[in-house]
Amino acid sequence: MTKLIFMGTPDFSATVLKGLLTDDRYEILAVVTQPDRAVGRKKVIQETPVKQAAKEAGLSIYQPEKLSGSPEMEDLMKLGADGIVTAAFGQFLPSKLLDSMDFAVNVHASLLPRHRGGAPIHYALIQGDEEAGVTIMEMVKEMDAGDMISRRSIPITDEDNVGTLFEKLALVGRDLLLDTLPAYIAGDIKPEPQDTSQVTFSPNIKSEEEKLNWNKTNRQLFNQIRGMNPWPVAHTFLKGDRFKIYEALPVEGQGNPGEILSIGKKELIVATAEGALSLKQVQPAGKPKMDIASFLNGVGRTLTVGERFGD
């Protein structure tokens, strides 16, 4: 039986962990995840999905603020683990820890070498990629730069957003890891170096990147909106107030970028640099998320054709 330390944080990681727990070829000696955080307006302390899954399985849990140089790292090195599996952990692993293991692999939610970094699923959508996927790779000190052990792709559809793609790729990552680990541990797979000429980076989304620029095409804005749904959520401004857009569809239309072209009972069409967007799910300032019909029947009922979204 191979003894593992698992490291991860979000739902994606929890799905991978649960997959490992179903396979009796592996024993999880410990789980490492990010500390509990205060979330939302009420600052409610929330455990990570990986911590919740580990508690349900009765596993030992470590939550260092920073793994490098921590007492937790020293404890982990004394457990006698054969290897480490990480999936969206959110911290760099110290070389000292990596060197103490027979192997260390990462489940990364992109088709490397494209989309190294912390937001690969977001950027696959924002940049209009036709496919997404998961890469199992060896861990090295440089971020997401290790040799690739295996890859698996899935198509991106127009119905996908960050939420749906996260769910799909979590299952892909779980299955690919279970399919890959036995042969890799046995030495039957020769990892492949990444082509450095094809590397792109997908760092965590910055707040300024959430703002919509109506001087882009309808397709570009469609990809930005779904590439931030359900988090961190794209926004614009309406009458000086922040206005979040969760869902929109590219449609035909022509006008000044940001201009309202038409208003119906269940339709709000806004011009872009090329074509237009039909807004479907929005959140006005100080209000909950709502469909466009509810918005137009409520706080949006005073809108008129010709008004503008934007600064």
From Swiss-Prot:
Keyword set includes Aminoacyl-tRNA synthetase: no
Catalysed reaction equations from the record: L-methionyl-tRNA(fMet) + (6R)-10-formyltetrahydrofolate = N-formyl-L-methionyl-tRNA(fMet) + (6S)-5,6,7,8-tetrahydrofolate + H(+)
UniProt keyword annotation of Cell wall biogenesis/degradation present: no
One term of GO molecular function: methionyl-tRNA formyltransferase activity
Binding-site list for (6S)-5,6,7,8-tetrahydrofolate: 110-113
Gene Ontology biological process terms, A to Z: conversion of methionyl-tRNA to N-formyl-methionyl-tRNA
Record-listed E.C. numbers: 2.1.2.9
Group of enzyme by EC: transferase
Domain of life, source organism: Bacteria
Keywords: Protein biosynthesis, Transferase
Listed Pfam families: Formyl_trans_C (PF02911), Formyl_trans_N (PF00551)
Stored InterPro entries: Fmt, Formyl_trans_C, Formyl_trans_C_sf, Formyl_transf_N, Formyl_transf_N_sf, Formyl_transferase-like_C_sf, GART_AS, Met-tRNA-FMT_C
Purpose of the protein: Attaches a formyl group to the free amino group of methionyl-tRNA(fMet). The formyl group appears to play a dual role in the initiator identity of N-formylmethionyl-tRNA by promoting its recognition by IF2 and preventing the misappropriation of this tRNA by the elongation apparatus.
Family the entry assigns: Belongs to the Fmt family.
Protein name according to UniProt: Methionyl-tRNA formyltransferase
